Amino acid sequence: MAKKSKIEKEKRIEATVAKYAAKRAALKAAGDYQGLAKLPRDASPVRAHHRDLTDGRPHAYMRAFGLSRLNFRQLAHKGQIPGVRKASW
């Protein structure tokens, strides 16, 4: 389980990215790089990281499912992820 403070920080960054998305796009299209530099650092989408939806783990994230490899494996073995089953050949 990730620290609650890290999970909250990621939520705050995602909210800031969403808040400034239109303004960033307009400044970028106009080529106003000084204006872009004046925006908050957290307004850049590059600073946002993917985290597991269940426990907030930042590493080994699978985008298609929104889970880390550990939780994906656990839920897949239980059969709780539709369309996923163990490979056999």
Curated annotation (Swiss-Prot):
Stored HAMAP family: Ribosomal_uS14_1
UniProt keyword Ribonucleoprotein, yes or no: yes
PANTHER family named among the record's database cross-references: 30S RIBOSOMAL PROTEIN S14, SMALL RIBOSOMAL SUBUNIT PROTEIN US14M
Coiled coil: none
Keyword Ribonucleoprotein: yes
Family, per entry: Belongs to the universal ribosomal protein uS14 family.
GO molecular-function term, one example from the UniProt record: structural constituent of ribosome
Listed InterPro entries: Ribosomal_uS14, Ribosomal_uS14_bac/plastid, Ribosomal_uS14_sf
Assembly and binders: Part of the 30S ribosomal subunit. Contacts proteins S3 and S10.
Domain of life: Bacteria
One example of a Gene Ontology biological process annotation: translation
Protein function: Binds 16S rRNA, required for the assembly of 30S particles and may also be responsible for determining the conformation of the 16S rRNA at the A site.
NCBIfam families noted in UniProt: PRK08881.1
Name recorded for this polypeptide: Small ribosomal subunit protein uS14
GO cellular component: cytoplasm; small ribosomal subunit
Keywords: Ribonucleoprotein, Ribosomal protein, RNA-binding, rRNA-binding
